[in-house]
């Protein structure tokens, strides 16, 4: 099936499949049925089969799924079988936390540069990489291969830097700034708003309290 016809919902479930299959491998599980995977992921078995059929199925009638094979194949679909050079713009608390998250490198996301506007941070080492000034970014992009840029900047600076990134050929931006970035069709932007997830949790907590107050 043409990848363009695969829904965003399916794509967003793939990392969950990958994560759960990785956990199964660590537990020594060699094969699993769609029903067993359904119970673990809280997704219907039918949905799992439909999702995986978009990419060829991978299962065998009466056998289920070979966990290691499926884990490897989903990793390939997600592009985790290649190295993705990555930079972080913003060396504050969030930027440094992301830089220090070692699992990114295990998945092929290799940090090659960190930048910030604050001269106080210039030269400090984060995971062995010295923080550079944002003014050095255009030259760095010309001299180094970079696929992904992570933005953890204030929103007024993020828009400006996104423009520079795009002008210098960056095609993938992971944006943590408090602004949704607009970009050309050939540039992929993943906007992440951490506070929205927390507000969703707050709503669910409020509803839970209302429900239990009514029952008392």
Residue ranges and their predicted role:
Residues 79-118:
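Glycine-rich adenosine-cofactor-binding loop
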Residues 1-30:
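Extreme N-terminal segment that seeds HTH/winged-HTH DNA-binding domains in transcriptional regulators
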Residues 22-25, 129-216:
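Phosphate-bearing ligand-interacting subdomains
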Residues 31, 35, 40-83:
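HTH-adjacent hinge/linker in prokaryotic transcriptional regulators
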Residues 121-124:
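A glycine-biased structural micro-motif
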Residues 76, 100, 163:
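Short, well-ordered alpha-helices that flank and scaffold nucleotide-derived cofactor binding pockets
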């Amino acid at each position: 099936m043409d990848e363009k016809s695969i829904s965003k919902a399916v794509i967003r479930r793939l990392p969950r499949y990958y994560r759960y299959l990785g956990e199964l491998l660590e537990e020594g599980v060699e094969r699993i049925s769609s029903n067993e995977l359904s119970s673990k992921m809280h997704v219907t078995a039918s949905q799992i089969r439909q999702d995986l059929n978009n990419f060829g199925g991978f299962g065998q009638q009466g056998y289920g799924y070979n966990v290691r094979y499926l884990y490897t194949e989903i990793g390939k679909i997600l592009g985790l079988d290649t190295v993705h050079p990555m930079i972080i713009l913003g060396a504050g608390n969030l930027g440094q936390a992301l830089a220090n998250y070692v699992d990114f490198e295990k998945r092929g996301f290799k940090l090659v540069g960190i930048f910030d506007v604050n001269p106080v941070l210039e030269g400090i080492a984060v995971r062995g990489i010295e923080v550079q000034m944002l003014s050095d970014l255009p030259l760095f992009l010309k001299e180094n291969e970079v696929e992904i840029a992570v933005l953890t900047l204030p929103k007024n600076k993020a828009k400006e830097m996104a423009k520079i990134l795009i002008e210098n050929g960056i095609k993938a931006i992971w944006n943590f700034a408090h602004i949704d970035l607009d970009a050309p069709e050939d540039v992929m932007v993943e906007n992440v708003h951490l506070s929205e997830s927390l507000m969703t949790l707050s709503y669910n907590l409020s509803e839970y309290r209302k429900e239990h107050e009514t029952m008392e």
